[in-house]
């Protein structure tokens, strides 16, 4: 659906700024793809290159089979009809009602009046604002304003929805509601969603895959569970530690440092179906080792369960080798602490 090849974006001036530095990505049709990074990482520039709002210095951007950097202004306008966009600060027209805001892109597109009315009411029902059709933005909460922004963005049936920090101005409860709505829209309409954010919650709750940006570059990319359960880049580890703490408490580390030949402290990481397996009981039953749980952390990445467990095992070397064999069979990753 979206292919980015060797993209570079440099802003001219007395001191040139390279906002995007040799980025290549492929975003699949129908997925929710997250791009996370700190302020100034290049996320917004990359997002704006996808709909042609920013012309790259070099590289290619393919959208739905079309290389958009070569398009004329008229061709680019036609392409943008396939792309909806929602913003951090809503960007609603204060002089228009909710209905009028959602109708605006359809009016510009020359849709017949009856078709506009029908479509606006459809999307307002989808976002849960049918009863607010005649209200003005000043009468709405932040979450309701963002729902209007989402309705406006999908009114013309786009294939792609670009989301620029859509929850950063919202409280935690409203953030959860907006994320749930975006996931529902993705499932019901099959729209490909690209969402940039600096909030880990956005990535862990709704994204299928993620790219981590730092200083204009993509430093890690992949399935959310793979990237965030096994991060290697320092910036990724910083983000992960805000929601998935893999830093063991000092008392556990101190305990692990008191070495004995008949015991080991292991850090186990597992995800998916393995997270629901009786791993500990199987180890004890099949190996005869004594096992103590020192630390644990469980949760979900989107709809995938994960677990992190620090355990201490007591037994001879042969039994401990059998423990490792079982963990390998179950695809549980282990690290000796």
UniProtKB/Swiss-Prot annotation:
Sequence intervals crossing the membrane: none
Keyword Mitochondrion: no
GO CC terms of this entry: plasma membrane
Membrane-topology descriptor: Peripheral membrane protein
Enzyme class: translocase
All copies of domain ABC transporter, residue ranges: 4-240
Signal sequence range: none
Localization in the cell: Cell membrane
EC annotation from Swiss-Prot or TrEMBL: 7.4.2.11
Family matches, as Pfam families: ABC_tran, NIL
Reactions listed under catalytic activity: L-methionine(out) + ATP + H2O = L-methionine(in) + ADP + phosphate + H(+); D-methionine(out) + ATP + H2O = D-methionine(in) + ADP + phosphate + H(+)
InterPro entries: AAA+_ATPase (IPR003593), ABC_transporter-like_ATP-bd (IPR003439), ABC_transporter-like_CS (IPR017871), ACT-like_dom_sf (IPR045865), MetN_ABC (IPR041701), MetN_ABC_transporter-like (IPR050086), NIL_domain (IPR018449), P-loop_NTPase (IPR027417)
Main location: membrane
Database matches in SMART domains: AAA, NIL
Matches recorded under PROSITE patterns: ABC_TRANSPORTER_1, ABC_TRANSPORTER_2, METN
GO MF entries: ABC-type D-methionine transporter activity; ATP binding; ATP hydrolysis activity
Binding site for ATP: 37-44
Keywords, ordered alphabetically: Amino-acid transport, ATP-binding, Cell membrane, Membrane, Nucleotide-binding, Translocase, Transport
Assembly behavior: The complex is composed of two ATP-binding proteins (MetN), two transmembrane proteins (MetI) and a solute-binding protein (MetQ).
Function text: Part of the ABC transporter complex MetNIQ involved in methionine import. Responsible for energy coupling to the transport system.
Family: Belongs to the ABC transporter superfamily. Methionine importer (TC 3.A.1.24) family.
Protein name: Methionine import ATP-binding protein MetN
UniProt organism field: Carboxydothermus hydrogenoformans (strain ATCC BAA-161 / DSM 6008 / Z-2901)
Taxonomic path: Bacteria, Bacillati, Bacillota, Clostridia, Thermoanaerobacterales
